[in-house]
Amino acid sequence: MLPYKKKENGLIIDCFKENTTWNMIYDLYVFDRKLRLLVFDAIERLEIAIRTQIIYQLSHKYGSHWQDNPNIFKAPERRVLRDGSIVTFDVYAEIQKHISEQLRSNRAEVFIQHYRNKYDTPVNPPSWMSVEVMYFSHLSRICTGLKNRADISGIANYFSLPPQIFCSWIHSINYIRNLCAHHARLWNREMSIVPEKLHFSKILTWISNPDTVQRGKIYYFFCMLDYLLQTANPTSSFKERLKTLLDEYKNVVSLPAMGFSEGWENEKMWK
């Protein structure tokens, strides 16, 4: 409802602008809900490709149970948070804990139950089973937690991205995914996690002038998603569905508030 609230001295006050109607507020709510569903669907398709590449690349190099090898991951790292508390980031321990929980679960996937009932060793299932039951957040942590840069390069190269940018983008996508999953407002949000900038691409279609785009707004995320889907799901209808949704609610939403740059529709990637 904030877009329809008045401002005084630059501050939003608890009073609606003139001529604001309930239908206007409701239409904005419906638009945001449809946008979340569209984005969540696209992320699911991307998630399959990321999961597949992690399994494929690391299994070829380290074998079927690479997830059980602590030597391929960075050492545990202690970090001081904004509130002064200290936490330890340990990717290997985190994924091992999750796999163990899945093995013990009474609601485990059928293929996990099969492995548990038939095999005693290795204790954990092979990576194509273990990674299948991981959350998107685990995939993001694996990418950032690999010790050898060459390991993440193999995954990032599939998506035509430098490793550092790929890890940043996947981290941002996980953040957006959580917003969608928890029904949070999406359309005009100022993102608390800002992805790194991709300046250009020689292989895939990208923004002609990234410097003009606000990376803390949802439009940049749309561009990221479309870029990744060019490889992950070339037949994806994401951009067509997005443009249709924007056109349907063109009298409801402000494109500048979403970070859309002037002339965005003329960009090659949105043709």
Which residues are covered by each model-predicted region?
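Long, contiguous internal "core" modules enriched in hydrophobic/ aromatic residues
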Residues: M1-K271
